[in-house]
From Swiss-Prot:
Disulphide connectivity of cysteines: none
Protein family membership: Belongs to the PlsY family.
GO terms, molecular function: acyl-phosphate glycerol-3-phosphate acyltransferase activity
Pathway of action: Lipid metabolism; phospholipid metabolism
Catalytic activity: an acyl phosphate + sn-glycerol 3-phosphate = a 1-acyl-sn-glycero-3-phosphate + phosphate
Protein's UniProt keywords contain Transmembrane helix: yes
Pfam families cross-referenced by the UniProt entry: G3P_acyltransf (PF02660)
Subcellular location: Cell inner membrane
This protein's record includes keyword Nucleotide-binding: no
Organism listed in the record: Anaplasma phagocytophilum (strain HZ)
Name of the protein described by the UniProt record: Glycerol-3-phosphate acyltransferase
Role played: Catalyzes the transfer of an acyl group from acyl-phosphate (acyl-PO(4)) to glycerol-3-phosphate (G3P) to form lysophosphatidic acid (LPA). This enzyme utilizes acyl-phosphate as fatty acyl donor, but not acyl-CoA or acyl-ACP.
Upper taxonomic lineage: Bacteria, Pseudomonadati, Pseudomonadota, Alphaproteobacteria, Rickettsiales
Highest taxon in the source lineage: Bacteria
Protein topology in the membrane: Multi-pass membrane protein
Amino acid sequence: MFIAILMGAYLLGSIPFAYILTKLMAKRDIREVGSKNVGATNVFRVNKGLAGLVLLLDIAKSAVLIYSLKEYDIVSTKEELCIVGLLSVLGHIYPIWLKFKGGKGVATGIGVIIPLNPLMLCVFFISWLFTFNNTRYASLSSIVSIIATMIVCYLTESGVVALLYTVQSILILFKHRENIVRLIKREEKKVI
């Protein structure tokens, strides 16, 4: 049963809302505009109003799944729920529907922590807003927030949960490697 849940988590995470919604509503292929990333920040560059919906749906695809599994006691341990979350994030980053070329996993990663650790969620948003307000770089804000939540996770969770969240965070940070290079070279574009 757990294997089926993991497969479902991956497939749900693989739904490329940024691609689908920009194709349907903006008549554009998100993979061919802006940063070419299949995520909410790039959608913002194409259609500001649509970006909020993409963000919510990318968060929801992991948050609703984990919340439901937890609430209905289908998956009982936090460790197993973290594995489900990790598969959702993997699906978002490497979606089967787009030849394994997806987004960076930040929003889907937020969806993982919403039902599991409210403190991590608060730290994520505070650090993201603080960094963004001072720099206007969405990528740097995400990187700082992921690192901050990793620290909080190690301080508040069991070793296995912290390890699983670290794996998830490393995947997300790895997807930001080009942003990191551009930030170092001072070539990264600000959002606003």
